[in-house]
Curated annotation (Swiss-Prot):
Gene Ontology CC terms: ribonucleoprotein complex; ribosome
The organism's place on the tree of life at top rank: Bacteria
BP terms from Gene Ontology: translation
Alphabetical list of HAMAP family matching this protein: Ribosomal_bS21
Family: Belongs to the bacterial ribosomal protein bS21 family.
GO molecular function, one term: structural constituent of ribosome
Alphabetized Pfam families for the sequence: Ribosomal_S21
Gene coding for it: rpsU
Name used for this protein in its record: Small ribosomal subunit protein bS21
Keywords associated with the record: Ribonucleoprotein, Ribosomal protein
């Protein structure tokens, strides 16, 4: 779990907030929260996963044709 501790000597809230946001982003907490906000049926999850794989494949094919 991300956390930022401040000393009394170097109390700069902006830097601490920036550091905290970076840690949260790296841990993937916000994306996980958005994903779990509503229940998604397993069939819908499989369908989305399959569509994403197809999209990646098409992108890869397009990239190969351009080069």
């Amino acid at each position: 779990m991300p956390g930022v501790f401040l000393n009394e000597d170097d109390y700069n809230f902006d830097i601490a907030l920036r550091r905290f946001k970076k840690q949260v982003e790296k841990a993937g907490i916000l994306s996980e929260m958005k994903k779990r906000q509503h229940y998604e049926k397993p069939s819908v999850m499989r369908k989305k996963k399959k569509a994403a794989a197809r999209k990646r494949l098409m992108k890869k094919i397009r990239k190969m044709n351009m080069a």
